[in-house]
């Protein structure tokens, strides 16, 4: 039986709420995406330069903490990923269609394979190499920050997009692209508004990311009472 999913509508108010963080604070951590995405626009930038931008963006977006193995590595581990991303530079575009799915999944697969092969060590067990905790969150954040072809699939996005527990695959990508196409008019309004406020172009998938992250964040906050307990 074919799965049915709720119709997801993007509204400008949530995007505006996300945007207000950067309007209020020009050094807000959300701005790290702009600098990373902008750096990857120029293929002539040195690999070392791009890897450093990618590392700081990931750190700013919470990927250098907790159980993430990249916490124990320096920025140069991303140089191999930069070379992979260069091959898919044609995916940097304003809008995505079902025709782009194969190439996006190829990029996802190559990045995941690359990071899965990286080992790291912890001080308390310096003789046994560990595998990086390569998650959909890490890989999609890399894709969003460099190519802009998918939103970052963290917990807040998945909650708002109704795909909790779902791994990134072709089916989920189709849903995301379909959502962006169904909300094209609103997304274009948001893009113009963002350009006016930040003087920077945001591709469609970044707008999708902003909306569903903010909605997931607000939904989570609404579940918390004043004493910090979940209703």
Named regions from a protein language model:
Residues 124-144:
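Helix-hairpin-helix
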Residues 1-130, 148-231:
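An N-terminal alpha-helical hairpin/helix-loop-helix interaction module that forms a charged
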